From Swiss-Prot:
GO MF term (any one): flavin adenine dinucleotide binding
Name of the protein described by the UniProt record: Flavin-dependent thymidylate synthase
Motif placement: ThyX motif: 95-105
This protein's encoding gene: thyX
Function comment: Catalyzes the reductive methylation of 2'-deoxyuridine-5'-monophosphate (dUMP) to 2'-deoxythymidine-5'-monophosphate (dTMP) while utilizing 5,10-methylenetetrahydrofolate (mTHF) as the methyl donor, and NADPH and FADH(2) as the reductant.
Length: 250
Protein backbone atom coordinates (compact mmCIF):
# COMPACT_ATOMS: atom_id res chain seq x y z
CA UNK A 1 0.00 0.00 0.00
CA UNK A 2 1.34 3.41 -0.98
CA UNK A 3 2.28 5.82 1.79
CA UNK A 4 0.32 9.06 1.97
CA UNK A 5 2.67 12.01 2.46
CA UNK A 6 2.03 15.64 3.45
CA UNK A 7 3.27 18.76 1.72
CA UNK A 8 6.72 19.92 2.80
CA UNK A 9 8.27 23.21 1.65
CA UNK A 10 11.88 23.95 2.55
CA UNK A 11 13.71 27.20 1.81
CA UNK A 12 17.15 26.08 0.61
CA UNK A 13 18.67 29.20 -0.96
CA UNK A 14 18.29 32.96 -0.79
CA UNK A 15 19.97 36.08 -2.12
CA UNK A 16 23.01 37.55 -0.40
CA UNK A 17 24.01 41.18 -0.88
CA UNK A 18 27.47 42.73 -0.85
CA UNK A 19 27.34 46.52 -0.85
CA UNK A 20 29.88 48.21 -3.14
CA UNK A 21 32.53 49.83 -0.92
CA UNK A 22 32.65 52.95 -3.09
CA UNK A 23 28.96 53.80 -2.56
CA UNK A 24 28.28 56.03 0.45
CA UNK A 25 25.04 54.35 1.45
CA UNK A 26 23.72 52.00 4.11
CA UNK A 27 20.40 50.40 4.94
CA UNK A 28 18.69 48.73 7.86
CA UNK A 29 18.18 45.45 5.96
CA UNK A 30 20.33 42.76 4.39
CA UNK A 31 20.08 40.03 1.77
CA UNK A 32 17.39 40.29 -0.88
CA UNK A 33 15.56 43.32 0.55
CA UNK A 34 18.82 45.28 0.71
CA UNK A 35 19.62 44.34 -2.89
CA UNK A 36 16.18 45.44 -4.08
CA UNK A 37 16.56 48.80 -2.33
CA UNK A 38 20.04 49.22 -3.78
CA UNK A 39 18.73 48.51 -7.29
CA UNK A 40 15.94 51.03 -6.86
CA UNK A 41 18.22 53.76 -5.54
CA UNK A 42 20.73 53.03 -8.30
CA UNK A 43 18.11 54.09 -10.83
CA UNK A 44 18.00 57.59 -9.36
CA UNK A 45 21.33 57.69 -7.50
CA UNK A 46 19.38 58.56 -4.35
CA UNK A 47 22.03 57.27 -1.95
CA UNK A 48 21.54 60.17 0.47
CA UNK A 49 17.89 59.19 1.07
CA UNK A 50 16.52 62.67 0.32
CA UNK A 51 12.92 61.68 1.04
CA UNK A 52 12.41 60.98 4.77
CA UNK A 53 9.23 59.04 4.00
CA UNK A 54 11.29 56.38 2.21
CA UNK A 55 14.41 56.45 4.36
CA UNK A 56 14.00 52.94 5.79
CA UNK A 57 14.17 49.75 3.78
CA UNK A 58 10.58 48.88 4.66
CA UNK A 59 9.17 52.28 3.67
CA UNK A 60 11.25 52.42 0.50
CA UNK A 61 10.15 48.99 -0.70
CA UNK A 62 6.55 49.68 0.23
CA UNK A 63 6.72 52.73 -2.04
CA UNK A 64 8.36 50.70 -4.81
CA UNK A 65 5.51 48.17 -4.70
CA UNK A 66 2.82 50.85 -4.44
CA UNK A 67 4.00 52.69 -7.55
CA UNK A 68 4.55 49.47 -9.50
CA UNK A 69 8.33 49.74 -9.96
CA UNK A 70 8.42 45.96 -9.71
CA UNK A 71 11.38 45.31 -12.01
CA UNK A 72 13.77 45.97 -9.12
CA UNK A 73 12.22 43.01 -7.27
CA UNK A 74 13.60 40.72 -9.95
CA UNK A 75 17.18 41.03 -8.67
CA UNK A 76 16.54 39.01 -5.49
CA UNK A 77 15.45 35.38 -5.40
CA UNK A 78 14.49 32.46 -3.19
CA UNK A 79 14.69 28.71 -3.83
CA UNK A 80 12.45 26.04 -2.32
CA UNK A 81 12.68 22.25 -2.28
CA UNK A 82 9.10 20.98 -2.38
CA UNK A 83 8.07 17.41 -1.56
CA UNK A 84 4.72 15.85 -0.81
CA UNK A 85 3.25 17.51 -3.88
CA UNK A 86 1.21 15.69 -6.51
CA UNK A 87 1.98 15.47 -10.19
CA UNK A 88 -1.31 17.20 -10.94
CA UNK A 89 -0.26 20.14 -8.76
CA UNK A 90 3.14 20.53 -10.39
CA UNK A 91 1.43 20.55 -13.79
CA UNK A 92 -0.20 23.78 -12.60
CA UNK A 93 2.94 25.06 -10.88
CA UNK A 94 5.17 24.83 -13.95
CA UNK A 95 2.82 27.11 -15.88
CA UNK A 96 4.48 29.97 -14.01
CA UNK A 97 7.14 30.62 -16.63
CA UNK A 98 9.34 32.98 -14.65
CA UNK A 99 10.32 30.25 -12.20
CA UNK A 100 13.17 27.80 -12.76
CA UNK A 101 12.46 24.12 -12.09
CA UNK A 102 14.30 20.86 -11.48
CA UNK A 103 11.85 18.00 -10.99
CA UNK A 104 12.11 14.31 -10.14
CA UNK A 105 12.40 12.34 -13.38
CA UNK A 106 10.06 9.39 -13.79
CA UNK A 107 12.25 8.22 -16.65
CA UNK A 108 15.23 7.66 -14.36
CA UNK A 109 13.67 7.11 -10.92
CA UNK A 110 11.53 3.96 -10.54
CA UNK A 111 8.04 4.59 -9.16
CA UNK A 112 7.26 1.08 -7.88
CA UNK A 113 7.32 2.37 -4.29
CA UNK A 114 6.12 5.92 -4.97
CA UNK A 115 4.12 7.84 -2.39
CA UNK A 116 0.67 9.36 -2.81
CA UNK A 117 -0.65 12.86 -2.15
CA UNK A 118 -4.31 12.94 -1.20
CA UNK A 119 -6.60 15.46 -2.88
CA UNK A 120 -7.62 17.90 -0.11
CA UNK A 121 -11.31 17.24 -0.79
CA UNK A 122 -11.06 13.61 0.38
CA UNK A 123 -8.74 13.98 3.38
CA UNK A 124 -11.43 14.00 6.06
CA UNK A 125 -13.57 11.19 4.65
CA UNK A 126 -12.24 7.67 5.42
CA UNK A 127 -14.39 6.12 2.69
CA UNK A 128 -13.02 8.48 0.04
CA UNK A 129 -9.47 8.00 1.31
CA UNK A 130 -9.94 4.24 0.94
CA UNK A 131 -11.16 4.69 -2.63
CA UNK A 132 -8.12 6.81 -3.51
CA UNK A 133 -5.80 4.26 -1.91
CA UNK A 134 -7.46 1.43 -3.85
CA UNK A 135 -7.17 3.28 -7.15
CA UNK A 136 -3.57 4.37 -6.65
CA UNK A 137 -2.49 0.91 -5.49
CA UNK A 138 -4.07 -0.60 -8.60
CA UNK A 139 -2.29 1.91 -10.82
CA UNK A 140 1.03 1.22 -9.17
CA UNK A 141 0.52 -2.54 -9.54
CA UNK A 142 -0.17 -1.98 -13.24
CA UNK A 143 2.98 0.14 -13.46
CA UNK A 144 5.11 -2.61 -11.90
CA UNK A 145 3.64 -5.28 -14.18
CA UNK A 146 4.02 -3.12 -17.27
CA UNK A 147 7.58 -2.21 -16.32
CA UNK A 148 8.59 -5.85 -15.91
CA UNK A 149 7.13 -6.83 -19.27
CA UNK A 150 8.68 -3.84 -21.02
CA UNK A 151 12.10 -4.65 -19.61
CA UNK A 152 11.70 -8.17 -20.95
CA UNK A 153 10.52 -6.91 -24.33
CA UNK A 154 13.45 -4.49 -24.53
CA UNK A 155 16.01 -7.05 -23.40
CA UNK A 156 17.84 -6.83 -26.73
CA UNK A 157 18.68 -3.14 -26.18
CA UNK A 158 22.40 -3.33 -25.36
CA UNK A 159 22.61 -0.16 -23.26
CA UNK A 160 21.19 -1.00 -19.83
CA UNK A 161 20.59 2.63 -18.88
CA UNK A 162 18.74 3.31 -22.12
CA UNK A 163 16.74 0.09 -21.72
CA UNK A 164 15.54 1.03 -18.23
CA UNK A 165 14.75 4.58 -19.34
CA UNK A 166 12.67 3.38 -22.28
CA UNK A 167 10.76 0.97 -20.05
CA UNK A 168 10.05 3.56 -17.36
CA UNK A 169 8.99 6.29 -19.75
CA UNK A 170 6.38 3.94 -21.19
CA UNK A 171 5.24 2.44 -17.89
CA UNK A 172 4.77 5.84 -16.22
CA UNK A 173 1.75 6.48 -18.45
CA UNK A 174 -0.44 4.50 -16.04
CA UNK A 175 0.65 6.34 -12.88
CA UNK A 176 -2.05 8.53 -11.31
CA UNK A 177 -1.94 12.29 -10.92
CA UNK A 178 -1.87 11.72 -7.15
CA UNK A 179 1.67 10.31 -7.39
CA UNK A 180 4.08 12.32 -5.25
CA UNK A 181 6.79 14.25 -7.02
CA UNK A 182 9.65 16.39 -5.76
CA UNK A 183 10.79 19.65 -7.24
CA UNK A 184 13.25 22.49 -6.75
CA UNK A 185 11.79 25.89 -7.60
CA UNK A 186 13.71 29.15 -7.89
CA UNK A 187 12.04 32.48 -8.47
CA UNK A 188 12.76 36.15 -8.10
CA UNK A 189 10.71 38.20 -5.66
CA UNK A 190 8.45 39.58 -8.37
CA UNK A 191 7.66 36.09 -9.65
CA UNK A 192 6.93 34.85 -6.13
CA UNK A 193 4.56 37.77 -5.49
CA UNK A 194 2.71 37.00 -8.71
CA UNK A 195 2.52 33.28 -7.88
CA UNK A 196 1.11 33.99 -4.42
CA UNK A 197 -1.41 36.49 -5.78
CA UNK A 198 -2.68 33.99 -8.35
CA UNK A 199 -2.47 30.74 -6.39
CA UNK A 200 -3.29 31.79 -2.82
CA UNK A 201 -6.65 33.03 -4.09
CA UNK A 202 -9.89 31.29 -3.12
CA UNK A 203 -10.38 30.57 -6.83
CA UNK A 204 -7.26 28.38 -7.00
CA UNK A 205 -7.17 24.62 -6.45
CA UNK A 206 -6.75 23.89 -2.75
CA UNK A 207 -3.51 21.91 -3.11
CA UNK A 208 -1.64 24.63 -4.98
CA UNK A 209 -3.21 27.22 -2.68
CA UNK A 210 -1.67 25.41 0.29
CA UNK A 211 1.65 25.46 -1.52
CA UNK A 212 1.41 29.19 -2.20
CA UNK A 213 0.59 29.96 1.42
CA UNK A 214 3.38 27.70 2.71
CA UNK A 215 5.82 29.59 0.47
CA UNK A 216 4.37 32.94 1.55
CA UNK A 217 4.89 32.20 5.24
CA UNK A 218 8.58 31.54 4.68
CA UNK A 219 9.02 34.43 2.26
CA UNK A 220 7.37 36.81 4.72
CA UNK A 221 9.90 35.73 7.34
CA UNK A 222 12.74 36.06 4.85
CA UNK A 223 11.73 39.42 3.37
CA UNK A 224 8.88 41.04 5.33
CA UNK A 225 9.34 44.35 3.49
CA UNK A 226 8.53 42.55 0.22
CA UNK A 227 5.84 40.07 1.27
CA UNK A 228 4.42 41.55 4.47
CA UNK A 229 1.49 43.19 2.68
CA UNK A 230 -0.17 39.79 2.16
CA UNK A 231 -2.72 38.82 4.82
CA UNK A 232 -3.62 35.17 5.40
CA UNK A 233 -7.27 34.48 6.25
CA UNK A 234 -9.29 31.33 6.89
CA UNK A 235 -12.41 30.64 4.83
CA UNK A 236 -15.60 29.03 6.11
CA UNK A 237 -14.47 25.63 4.82
CA UNK A 238 -11.29 25.82 6.90
CA UNK A 239 -8.93 26.44 3.99
CA UNK A 240 -6.69 29.48 3.84
CA UNK A 241 -6.25 32.31 1.36
CA UNK A 242 -3.84 35.22 1.09
CA UNK A 243 -4.69 38.65 -0.24
CA UNK A 244 -2.91 41.97 -0.65
CA UNK A 245 -4.18 45.45 -1.52
CA UNK A 246 -0.93 46.03 -3.43
CA UNK A 247 -1.27 43.35 -6.11
CA UNK A 248 -1.67 44.94 -9.54
CA UNK A 249 -0.40 42.22 -11.87
CA UNK A 250 -2.86 39.58 -13.01
Amino acid sequence: MAEIVPLRVQLIAKTDFIAPPDIDWSTDADGGPALVEFAGRACYQSWSKPNPRTATNESYLRHVIEVGHLSVLEHASATFYITGISRSCTHELIRHRHFSYSQLSQRFVPEDDSNVVLPPAVEDDPELVALVRKATDASRAAYVELLEKLESTLADVPNAVLRRKQARQAARSVLPNATETRIVVTGNYRAWRHFIAMRASEHADVEIRRLAIACLRQLADLAPSIFGDFDIATLADGTEVAISPLVYEG
